């Protein structure tokens, strides 16, 4: 039987569940409580996996030592990571079997971990990115160290922000959204932890490998063969967990956000496996050779690269947008039909668009034309999604004015519409002749990465943190305002600097004098770029400062005491009694 208070909360819906508060967990006690919440068999399985992983790390270290290969360092990283995680697991390993009552509530501990680690990766990745920006303006900032060269720092930046920040945020929010929209608890408690911890091990291997010079030299797919195999294991577990949870849903309808999340998970698995098909030079070394070569290798890489943008940086974050924006605005999606049309349009058209990255190359022209055509058609489903998000705010624009969290999401939708228009425009061959290989492309990418991906992620995290930790609100709404304006200013400075530098570059490279020779040398174009590169670094610095402000605000929200101690004895409503959110 529900208590009188529980019944009242049920009638008012999930909107008020974030008011149910509890004292903030101390770090040690919190970890112990999380581990003791696992069943004995789940703890045992976790220990078996970690011990096996430690032995794999030891074997990698030994093999690398014999060959004097960088795999030795990665072996020690895997070993230390496994031993450290084992020590954490031992904190609550001997706890008794948890009560079956835990199954009546949603399982949010993995989402909490994912949100926190996403913000850590955000600061790390953005710091490296801003370092790279200053490095391009002042090349001596390498300090004569090989690991600090552009070729090693740049993939560390992209992996840190795309896969570390973006990937952890997607995994954490997908667990949160899937449970609420399905009215079903995660299928088990071991899999989400395996996914999150295993995924972050992959990110650590990737970034540390780049700094040591371990790379396949494929953009967004730089990690070597053993890291790729590990990610396949982790990602298949993620896919199976998502499908198993959806299969046991109590809500008959699958909400559209889950469509986008599932497309993100499924297609990224396919892309990763195909593009990373390779033969190791030795199982005791890091080096491998792709199964593809020549123009086929280039086409496979950009089929992967552009669809990583499509399904990792677009579909997944549209799932985030379609849940958190209407929840925060307290408005239904403007048109559910538009969201479905946009989903199928993006899913079908994006798969064919990758070849526009290879205009004016050895790729057959008909393949280039095919990519250009589908890229232009992509504008329709992309703008459907952007318009649907903005029209959802009809009747709630006063909230956008007053609520910086909602403003993050609104501005993200605006940048999504702008960057997709720009992408379709730049895919046209005649336009691409000017933009190809210039900073215009960098500006376009960061309009999407900073303006769309980062802003929707920050907005969603600000929305979900009080709900996950049962706090009444974020620690400081004023700091959310500060973060918003720092992020927006940083994005605009960065993007406009790159648009200007890119167009100037393209024009200088194609300017001829009367004798038919180039009017400007390459060095002339580099000198002309310097003020824009400084502006880019300043814009990136503002964005980084905003992320640090966000980390502080989120941490203080987690640590802050209950604002409503009278409700501290309340417990969450059973999942099977909650309306789908």
Regions found by a protein language model. Give the residues of each.
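Intrinsically disordered, low-structural-confidence terminal and linker regions
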Residues: 1-58, 62
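Cytosolic juxtamembrane amphipathic/interface segments immediately preceding
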Residues: 32-38, 100-113
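Membrane-interface helix termini and inter-helical loops of multi-pass transporters
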Residues: 216-219, 361-364, 432-436
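Surface-exposed loop and adjacent secondary-structure segments within mature catalytic domains
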Residues: 222-223, 285-293
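Short, highly charged, low-complexity non-transmembrane loops/tails of multi-pass membrane proteins
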Residues: 562-580
